[in-house]
């Protein structure tokens, strides 16, 4: 299994990450599509080839082609939006009413349940450090019926995969 490849490749100092990966992959808080879509979207957001490759392989066993495309779409559109909305926030009130003017059609028609796409967008936004987008997507998934525990499960996946990507980069540079 690909997740096992990631875990076995982690150094001893990343044992907590290894254990967290195992626990999160067995999570029952999320549906299978929510879980593996989160793993895939976040793996893409880490920008780490090994993490993305290993997670992609395993996610393909759990997700439809539509869900794979939607998860990768969430990672891609959030890469754009997170930069734009962070900048808008930094620039202050003078920019609050400035129209974004960027196409974001995938958010309206992601090809999967809206709540799943929004959850993946939230997880990616946490990796990318966009407070505005994280809060906006949290509000949407809460209104769609997800619990705080389900939302935080996606955040834990994001945090753990980012840590795994960091450990892999550290080891590659040693």
From Swiss-Prot:
InterPro entries in alphabetical order: AhpD, AhpD-like, AhpD_core, CMD-like
Superkingdom, taxonomy of origin: Bacteria
Catalytic activity: N(6)-[(R)-dihydrolipoyl]-L-lysyl-[lipoyl-carrier protein] + a hydroperoxide = N(6)-[(R)-lipoyl]-L-lysyl-[lipoyl-carrier protein] + an alcohol + H2O
Disulfide bond sites: 130-133
Any Pfam family matching the protein: CMD
Glycoprotein as UniProt keyword: no
Catalytic center residues: 130, 133
Record bears the keyword Disulfide bond: yes
Key words of the record: Antioxidant, Disulfide bond, Oxidoreductase, Peroxidase, Redox-active center
Biological process according to GO: cell redox homeostasis; response to oxidative stress
GO MF terms, alphabetically ordered: alkyl hydroperoxide reductase activity; disulfide oxidoreductase activity; hydroperoxide reductase activity; peroxiredoxin activity
EC numbers for this chain: 1.11.1.28
EC class (word): oxidoreductase
Family as reported in the entry's similarity comment: Belongs to the AhpD family.
Function: Antioxidant protein with alkyl hydroperoxidase activity. Required for the reduction of the AhpC active site cysteine residues and for the regeneration of the AhpC enzyme activity.
Description of how the protein assembles with itself and partners: Homotrimer.
Listed PANTHER family: ALKYL HYDROPEROXIDE REDUCTASE AHPD
Protein name, UniProt field: Alkyl hydroperoxide reductase AhpD
Protein source organism: Corynebacterium diphtheriae (strain ATCC 700971 / NCTC 13129 / Biotype gravis)
Taxonomic lineage: Bacteria, Bacillati, Actinomycetota, Actinomycetes, Mycobacteriales
């Amino acid at each position: 299994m690909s997740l096992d490849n990631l875990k076995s490749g982690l150094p001893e100092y990343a044992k907590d990450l290894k254990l967290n990966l195992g626990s999160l992959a067995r999570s029952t808080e999320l549906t299978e599509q929510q879980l593996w879509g989160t793993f895939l979207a976040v793996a893409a957001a880490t920008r780490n080839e090994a993490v993305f490759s290993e997670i992609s392989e395993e996610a393909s066993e759990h997700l439809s082609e539509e869900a794979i495309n939607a998860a990768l779409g969430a990672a891609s559109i959030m890469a754009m939006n997170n930069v734009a909305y962070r900048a808008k926030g930094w620039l202050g009130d003078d920019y609050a009413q400035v129209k974004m003017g960027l196409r974001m059609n995938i958010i309206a028609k992601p090809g999967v349940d809206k709540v799943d796409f929004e959850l993946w967008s939230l997880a990616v936004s946490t990796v990318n450090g966009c407070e505005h987008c994280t809060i906006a997507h949290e509000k949407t998934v809460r209104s769609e019926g997800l619990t705080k525990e389900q939302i935080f499960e996606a955040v834990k996946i994001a945090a753990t995969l980012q840590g795994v990507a960091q450990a892999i980069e550290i080891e590659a540079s040693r």
